[in-house]
Amino acid sequence: MNEQNSYYAFISYNSADEKWAKWLQHNLEYYHIPSALCKEYPELPKKIRPVFWYKQDLSGTKLKKALNNELSSSKYLIVICSPDSAKADWVNDEVVAFIEQGKGDRIIPFIVAGTPHAKNPDEECFPPALRNLTRDEEIRGIDVRRKEGKSHALVDVIATMFGVRFDVLWQRHERRRKKIRNIWIAIASVFLL
């Protein structure tokens, strides 16, 4: 990350989705990047830190200006997408600001509820700025509700930020998870003997 980007990512969300913002921020910052991947891609960071998320609803001109500064010093914008965030003016404003900064290709929609481009407005999860992109600008959303689960969605976000294929990162993630599980099984079996 260069000096221009104080934050690896900025999480934009509505207060109704705060638990998702908190979960995502924590899991990104504490994700252990597989060492084999770092060897294969030496340009990758060792950690995904810091990740910015604001814990309260936005109000006040000074606060908006401060958040725009944080947004402009972020490498990626992760938008927690739900019907609540689709209706939140400040979520849309943050997406618009990021696009205006020339970083529209670094927006990652993280879908937690609703449907992108829904026929029923009550089910729409994308804020207007994401719905109104041209066909060439359209962004693929990462849906946490898929049967693969939250861990799968987290790895998908990281793979997207790193510009590596999902399956490459997922295989290494699963290998590490199995290795840790086997270590815990070995430790538990020692205590059971």
Where would I find each of the regions flagged by the language model?
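Redox-cofactor binding/interface segments in oxidoreductases and associated redox assembly factors
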Residues: 79
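Short mixed-charge
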Residues: 30-51
